[in-house]
Amino acid sequence: PDVLDSDPKVIFFFSSIASFMGTVFDGYFSSFNQITEAEAMTYGEHSNECEMLYLNCDKNQVDPVGPAMLSVMAHELEHLIHFEIDPYEESWVDEGCAEYAMVLFGHPDPLTGFPQNPGNGLTVWDSEFADYVQTQLFFTYLSEQFGGAAFIKQIVSETTTSIQGIEDALVSSGFQINFDS
């Protein structure tokens, strides 16, 4: 996507990422880079006015040149792509698609956290590790049942959000099933 700067390149910015509220991230996408500096400042933020992903180069977190970092890059790139198509998507769907991107690259998040939280709601996003794992499992299931990566791409392409977006992707892919089935 090159909507803002007309440059098809994506900048991968490697830096030592400080912790946020006690959590250290392997990478992140900032939607503020997708608007002008003037717009970002109205939110008290700044914009690089380009397609940019931030990746942690602290080897204590993840090897910045190792195969796991490719999965992190795929995860963050999915956020960038999804934002350009559907900036109002619910977090649980966007994160589920991003977690699925990590599965495709062979280094998904470990399946920890979810077994200790089996009552964790799929569509209620609290940014807990169990939320990420749960959406990873659910979107991997959707992929396996309804057409692989092409189906996940269809979900990303839908401009309707949340459950309705998944149902619309099912219909667009020729499945006569709804979310509650």
Where are these regions (language model features)?
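Extended hydrophobic/Leu-rich segments
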Residues: P1, F139-L142, L170, I177
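Extracytoplasmic/secreted envelope proteins and their assembly/folding machinery
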Residues: S71-A74, E78, E95, E99-M102, ...
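Juxtacatalytic substrate-recognition/specificity segment
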Residues: P1-E90, C97, H107-L111, N120-V124
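Phenylalanine-focused residue identity feature
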Residues: F12-F14, F20, F25, F29-F32, ...
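Beta/coil-rich, acidic/histidine-enriched accessory regions frequently appended to metallopeptidases
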Residues: T161-S181
